[in-house]
Amino acid sequence: MEQGEASPPVPAEHEAKCDTSNNEEEGELFDFDSGDEVPEADRQVPSADDRTRGAEAGGADENTCPAGNGTGAEPAPEAEPAKLVVPTKVNPYSVIDITPLQEDQPSSPDANTEEEGVGLRVPSGYSVPVPCGYAVPSNLPLLLPAYSSPVIIRAESVEEEEAAETVGDGQCNSLSSEDLPHSSEQGSQEGSALARWAADPANTAWMENPEEAIYDDVPRENSDSEPDEMIYDDVENGEEGGNSSPEYGWSSSEFESYEEPSDSEGKNGIPRSFLRSSHKKQLSHDLTRFKAHCEEKMRGLVASTVGAMEIQQAKQRQERKMQKLMKAAKEGTKDGLEKTKAAVKRGGSFIRTRSLVSQDHRCYFEEEQNLFIDVDCKHPEAVLTPMPEGLSQQQVVRRYILGSIVESEKNYVDALRRILEQYEKPLSEMEPRLLSDRKLRMVFYRVKEILQCHSMFQIALASRVSEWDVVETIGDVFVASFSKSMVLDAYSEYVNNFSTAVAVLKKTCATKPAFLEFLKLSQDSSPDRVTLHSLMMRPIQRFPQFILLLQDMLKNTAKGHPDRLPLQMALTELETLAEKLNERKRDADQRCEIKQIAKAINERYLNKLLSSGNRYLVRSDDVIETVYNDRGEIVKTKQRRIFMLNDVLMCATASSRNSHESHAVMSQRYLLKWSVPLGHVDVIQYNGGSGAGEHCRHHAAHSPESLAVVANAKPHKVYMGPGQLYQDLQNLLHDLNVVGQISQLIGNLRGSYQNLNQSVAHDWTSGLQRLILRKEDAIRAADRCRIQLQLPGKQDKSGRPTFFTAVFNTLTPAIKESWVSSLQMAKLALEEENHMGWFCVDDDGNLAKKETHPLLVGHMPVMVAKQPEFKIECAAYNPEPYLSNESQPASPSTARGFLWIGSCSNQMGQVAIVSFQGSNPKVIECFNVESRILCMVYIPAEESKPQETTETKDPEATASRAPHVPTICLGTEEGSISIYKSSQGCKKVRLQHFYAPDKSTVMSLACSPQGLYAGLVNGSVASYTKAPDGSWNSEPQQVIKLGVLPVRSLLLVEGALWAASGGQVFMASVETHTIENQLEAHQDEGMVISHMAVAGVGIWIAFTSGSTLRLFHTETLKHLQDVNIDAPVHSMLPGHQRLSVTSLLVCHGLLMVGTSLGVVVALPVPRLQGIPKVTGRGMVSYHAHNGPVKFIVSATAFQNKDRARDSPRSGSELQDEDPKDLLCSEEGPSCPGQPDTYTSVWLGDSLGLPTQKNDLSSSSGSLNLSHGSSSLEHRSVDSSLCDLLRDPSASPRSRPQGSRRARASSALVVCGGQGHRRVHRKARQPSQEDLVSSVMVWQIPLLGM
């Protein structure tokens, strides 16, 4: 025999590829590895026992199996002696152990019966293994077979599936059931030949000395032969297995000896028909055919097998996974147990030998369908009864909303049925097949399961609708139907698969015109002509629709209605479900997008770079790149696409190409221009530092060098773009200063001249001021969409780093704001302090890395002089108003206010003011107070009426009145209440100072538009009102006596004052000052309430001792949830120290808890107006204070209501305003209604004008415009330039009313305590600096908002 004949035949192409269209389980449900797609090189061919299972019924093993049992139901014999049990039914996907039998194994009665029925008796010393069919000496050392390795099922890509279908869709397997009769007849003949040969004593004489004879195809366990090379391909490692070694499979030593004669073998009488040698003997015709059949089967087996160790490892992984699942089921709920059982069922199909028998797939489909309840039975539809008479208006509205819910659900279920009946069913039945079974499952994945979930919901809905006039509740039906884990599983798998399904449909439409025609016919035949894509979008849109409907229902449900709490719970469940779906979809999309980008980019090294590690796509944007020459002129513009990854920024040119000539299917390809590490990317902003935005104002002049657009441009060149606009503004400011000096000199003239007088000089000044306003508008318009990046370049010849500048323009100002914010967040996440910022474990106890955890911006001391005797006690945040327009995000993404921090020593207090106006927070003022500060609260400015604004002439008088400026109220230990003015640029100004009744210590403060409330140490609450002049009355209007214990916490909840005294919470009316209700927060004696935080319709309560938080419903006062933070904290911190809650905050989907150990715990909660229950595991910060966390506050900007509905006005509109309307108080932009977006930017030094302020006031407040001036020589030039560069959204006539605002991508949270430390770092003795009062600033990503 030739050497090439020893190699097993490569499986037929149609056999290998036909499996891709079989109905097998995708590898997404129960993945034991990373979950990513298996590389092409690692794909495994079908295992041999499955490929030959159909032939075993007619082969040599037919003699050991009953007739007709061709599905492999015979139990696999084990290596260890054990009693063989023949099961009635075997899962065709389970792993079958095909270890050869031992002679000393006790044979089961069933096996004997089978042998007798067949009539073949195997001689002593032999056993016939089920899968192989050739005899093995029973006393040879056992080897685990290498052809029963498990196959990890994975989802093939669309390209692989397309390649498989080019061979032919729907080809039958070569080992189908149609070949069984012929195989059975042939096997019977070969079996009789084996029996006749084995009965001859001459043929078995060699067994007397078995140690000298081994088969070449059954290697000895103690063989010391060293195979030199492998002549078989590494079937496990695919094409990459070219350099195979014996550890991967069968070596050449096991087959090369077949060519050579062996004297010892001949002497001992081993039948050469089993040795595969070239020696020819007189063999019977039957035995020759049997030998050839065994050789062919053996080659097929060996070619499709992998190492025996793989199956053992897979079994161990399965056992570990099962142990974890059962542990989770025992610790979870009944629903979790059912989910575990379903997962175990699914998991059994993932570690199995791949089967090509169609019956196996039918069994699998039956198994998968059994995971969901079939509710296709007839049930009555949900139909509202006729509306009875005498209903209130609210009841009528609720009935209409219920009708909308019923009609919406009916249409949704009909859409799901149309997908299955009009598309999936015809495609699965038509011949020839347009979509393979595998593609059908990819396209319509989990649609049936979603339909079953909603069919059950429809049954419950119909039952409730039928009794609506009696019950009038619907929220509990939603809670019961959509709080099940099966709903989350079905929807998440559908949503994650949606993009893949759409890709399959698009590609099939392009490659198969018949499929496109089928979709068109199906659409035309439908009454509403809805496309398949629109129908498939319905599940993605369903939960937002539910949330909107329930919100409408809740708005029309009065307090005290029995359906109100169930509706709020339903909203919470739906929002939590939607949030989890979004999170899973986001994770799946990030992995998918990075693979698509890696495939579409032409750089090979970058392709490998993108495919490695935990890299994911943050965002991609289409922008216009502008290129300038040395003179600052625009050379060209080019459309680019910027890919922002979590650690890389890439710029590429997008190009489309036709993938098929006959159909216009465009596939994106990218030509990479540059890629740089994200940490080296800097945004150049002319009008402020990073994050300052357009609200930052500068006194210092910008040099021409800093305004250049090109990095290496020369200072004396003239530049276009924002740099040139800033230079023009500088020139105008210079000229205005000169004209001011000329005006003063003209006043010294003693003569009278026609064209040289004060009137002319005033006209010059007014004209320059108008030009300055126009120039500022042009700068703002140019900067709104412009992103200028400084990027690292190649090193120069001397090895020094170089930089280059890229200028991009986004499509809208909102995109620019969002892009810059995303860049800031991504760079922040790369900093060393955030690499391990939070400790979080999953359900299995493993560390889980979350991308939405708060990021540490920084930590800083808050004392001007480091004084460790002052310890932080409380804080209050004073937000600055911002203008809400389309050019800026109506969001708290960038705080622009001031944080007042109160610290205490033994006898006195100190206030530090931290400003968030710039890119980095900094302490701008610090002063002492007479007594220890225990609490403080921010009091917003009272909105002034329009007539009061026009009548006010004196800006100083306006600023001094308390109602029109924001203030901070301090409560001290000595019982005094101090009111301080708080606004931009102001110094310490105390407006009022008075004492509480009996000079009782002020423990807590709260304010409302009606009054100021102080919780006292004697168990009373003092209520203060405002005097006619806007100041607070020093005597309380009412003192509410609650008890004898201190009032530690005050909250205003829906017009009622909640006061915590001891372990009780009292609800008092802010109008009548009477106690309306009270709540017993804890039944244990000695539990004292320390903190309260309200969100939605729930209130979280913490206690001075213990680590448990309690959630109560604010309307019914029902106890809803308990959360103990002890477990997550002590999972991270060593030892077991006493833990208590020292601060509390609910914001942006997180319940943030400050602890006595200095760490912060963040628990996820919903964001809507539902119940803020904790929906997941908590995170514990690795950044901590050296003492208790004294406060946690949210640094959130608020909208300027006076100008929120107005649009930005241009300079031409401002010049027509009355001068008195442009006057501003000394507070500048912080004045209520002052649009700081429209004001000019003073970039030069003080101009010496009488109206110029020395603080941060805007230039529009210092302008006294003159009417009637017509001497503006440069007006036409500057006007045209301004019109070209002004943002179209600045005009109210050109802006659409429905234009979208930018969304916030992050929010700031500040916590304070003593010093800063990093948990789990080497412990050291804290120094004096470590005990200084400090704050930590966190930035919270808002990905889900």
UniProtKB/Swiss-Prot annotation:
Modified residues (Phosphoserine): 157, 355, 1262
GO biological process: centrosome duplication; mitotic spindle assembly; myelination in peripheral nervous system; positive regulation of Rho protein signal transduction; positive regulation of stress fiber assembly
The keyword Ion transport appears for this protein: no
Bias type Polar residues, positions: 102-111, 171-191
Coiled coil: 307-335
Biased composition (Acidic residues): 22-39, 224-239
GO MF annotations, alphabetized: guanyl-nucleotide exchange factor activity; kinesin binding
Name this protein carries in UniProt: Rho guanine nucleotide exchange factor 10
Species, as recorded: Mus musculus (Mouse)
Taxonomic lineage from the root: Eukaryota, Metazoa, Chordata, Craniata, Vertebrata
